[in-house]
Amino acid sequence: MSLESVRYSRGSLQVLNQLLLPHKSEYEPVTGVQQGADAIRTMKVRGAPAIAIVGVLSLAVELTTKPCQDVPSLITFVRESLHHLVSARPTAVNMKKAADELNAFLAEEADKPGATSQRLTESVVQWAESLLKKDVEDNQMIGDFGAKHILEKAGPTEKVCMLTHCNTGSLATAGYGTALGVVRSLHALGRLSHVFCTETRPYNQGSRLTAYELVYEKIPATLITDSMASVTMRERKVTAVVVGADRVVANGDTANKIGTYQLAIIAKYHGIPFYVAAPSTSCDLSLPTGGSIVIEERPSHELTDINGIRIAAPGIDVWNPAFDVTPHELITGIITERGVFKPEELKDGLTKGQ
């Protein structure tokens, strides 16, 4: 059984405070939009899919427990709440796409004859709940598509060795995970020999969260420092690198956790395939290249301090971007719930049939 980043029933939302992991597992209530935005901004919950899910569910909870009295006030509240949630962490596109889709859905429902605040509230809540269910289904498909694709490149009985970065598992999504979902699927098939996970400085999502998930599920794994990636790829016969994404744009350029770009360069040098695993909700086809992606910058103390104890020299300047952009030329394939695409095939692959 996978870990849960969120626990939801209608009118009630709890998020696993990931700042306390791996030492303490504690779920905290989210009673409304402001608490949802705070949980996202402070990284109690993180991962592009999970951010969107917590965002829309926090809205659903507040609408359920504190319903609006008329249609105009409901529309205004939803629009302003979604804007606030999007601004909490702007690089991840999932929350922005969910906000745009929900605003459009609500406007369409409000134009129907007989629309009332009660009916519209029910529609919004159901929409938010459907996002939770769909994310788990999409992640399982990503895992299975990715595992199948990687195994097709291997021998018929060969086990594969993977390397991954940051945290892209159940803790970053509604369940199962994206890049870590691929690892899970390989393990379930009995075809995973080992996975290496990077510590992912400065927030240590790899050592705190990914390692926690891998130990929890008894998947054979080894934690490495970020600076060990080169020697690991060379010495440990890594089959492929698989990472997640906070935003993939039309040409395949990918924004992901800081350090992803250098992993792609190292993989290219060693002739190792480099895959991005992401749901279509993380793909922003409105941006032609990664140069337009807004990169969030985090506070300096996240780099200079650990658990409130300063480890860096006082007075040193700090640059702490949360993400970097990997050029599409370094990416072998993008694994989505609709299949695996080369970067240049992504836009057509995701728009076909729409």
UniProtKB/Swiss-Prot annotation:
Catalyzes the interconversion of methylthioribose-1-phosphate (MTR-1-P) into methylthioribulose-1-phosphate (MTRu-1-P). InterPro entries: IF-2B-related, IF-M1Pi, IF_2B-like_C, Initiation_fac_2B_a/b/d, M1Pi_N, NagB/RpiA_transferase-like. Gene3D superfamilies: translation initiation factor eif-2b, domain 1, Translation initiation factor eif-2b, domain 2. It is found in: Cytoplasm; Nucleus. It comes from Xenopus laevis. The keyword Nucleus applies. Pathway: Amino-acid biosynthesis; L-methionine biosynthesis via salvage pathway; L-methionine from S-methyl-5-thio-alpha-D-ribose 1-phosphate: step 1/6. Its EC number is 5.3.1.23. GO terms for biological process: L-methionine salvage from methylthioadenosine. It is an enzyme of class 5 (isomerase). The record marks 166 as: Transition state stabilizer. Signal peptide: none annotated. This is Methylthioribose-1-phosphate isomerase. One of its GO terms (cellular component) is cytoplasm. Keywords: Amino-acid biosynthesis, Cytoplasm, Isomerase, Methionine biosynthesis, Nucleus. Belongs to the eIF-2B alpha/beta/delta subunits family. MtnA subfamily. It comes from the Eukaryota. The active site is at residue 246. One of its GO terms (molecular function) is S-methyl-5-thioribose-1-phosphate isomerase activity. PANTHER family: METHYLTHIORIBOSE-1-PHOSPHATE ISOMERASE. It catalyses: 5-(methylsulfanyl)-alpha-D-ribose 1-phosphate = 5-(methylsulfanyl)-D-ribulose 1-phosphate.
